[in-house]
UniProtKB/Swiss-Prot annotation:
Ca(2+) 1 binds at D122, E123, E128, S132. The keyword Calcium applies. InterPro entries: CRISPR-assoc_prot_Csn2-typ, Csn2_sf. This is CRISPR-associated protein Csn2. GO terms for biological process: defense response to virus. The keyword Translocase does not apply. Belongs to the CRISPR-associated Csn2 protein family. CRISPR (clustered regularly interspaced short palindromic repeat), is an adaptive immune system that provides protection against mobile genetic elements (viruses, transposable elements and conjugative plasmids). CRISPR clusters contain sequences complementary to antecedent mobile elements and target invading nucleic acids. CRISPR clusters are transcribed and processed into CRISPR RNA (crRNA). Binds dsDNA, binding is disrupted by EGTA. GO terms for molecular function: DNA binding; metal ion binding. Its cofactor is Ca(2+). Keywords: Antiviral defense, Calcium, DNA-binding, Metal-binding. It comes from Streptococcus pyogenes serotype M1.
Length: 220
């Protein structure tokens, strides 16, 4: 994947955990705003090796780590849809669930018919069953680092998401914590962009300085 915008002479490749430092406050603010309001035809471009633009729905943006709700309706909708797809790929499990749902439905229908009121009912789908069971992410994060790791784990699970963007996360993480996150990102083959307003320790990073020159630091 690649990133491009007007101040760059050429696109920046996004591989694993990429750190991009924007030293000019106005530029940093503007790029964060572009990410927040991202559209396929916006000035900020994310695209793959085939020059295909990354869709808004394929990007996960985290501007407030502590305030990020891993059980928001948007996240849960994606998780439930992925679970449904998993069941569809396992015919034996899906068949077993369908039989159990049919049995439960028959019992409820019988009671509806016995009731004096003229009751209606609908068949329940696997997706509706997942929702009714209240399937959600169990959160156990006590620190900002643990919350970041939790977000990465959720992002890994969401197959329709292609890019995760952390904004100014380095301000809350130690060098060892950033290293641990980078290791996890590398091992799980994720694509993550860290947007930072200042240099992030001595990790490999791209730095767009206040004169708008792009510098690479600590690159192997």
């Amino acid at each position: 994947m690649n990133l491009n915008f007007s101040l760059l002479d050429e696109p920046i490749p996004l591989r694993g955990g990429t750190i991009l430092v924007l030293e000019d406050v106005c530029v940093f603010s503007k790029i964060v705003q572009y990410c927040y309001q991202y559209e396929e035809d916006s000035e900020l471009k994310f695209f793959d090796h085939k020059m295909k633009t990354i869709k808004e729905s394929e990007i996960m943006l985290v501007t407030d780590i502590l305030g990020f709700d891993v059980n928001s309706s948007t996240i849960l909708k994606l998780i439930h849809a992925d679970l449904e797809s998993q069941f569809n790929e396992k015919p034996e499990v899906k068949s077993m669930i369908d039989k159990l749902v049919a049995t439960i439905t028959e019992l409820i229908v019988f009671e509806c018919l016995e009731n004096e009121l003229d009751l209606e009912y609908d068949e329940i789908t696997i997706l509706e069953l997942i929702k009714s069971l209240g399937v959600k992410v169990e959160t156990q994060s006590d620190t900002i680092f643990e919350k970041c790791l939790e977000i990465l784990q959720i992002f890994k699970y969401l197959t329709k998401k292609k890019l995760l963007i952390f904004v100014n996360s380095g301000a809350f993480l130690t060098k060892d914590e950033v290293a641990s996150l980078q290791e996890y990102i590398s091992l799980t083959n994720l694509t993550v962009l860290f947007l930072e307003p200042r240099e992030l320790y001595d990790f490999p990073q791209y730095i767009l300085d206040e004169d708008y020159f792009l510098i690479t630091k600590n690159m192997v």
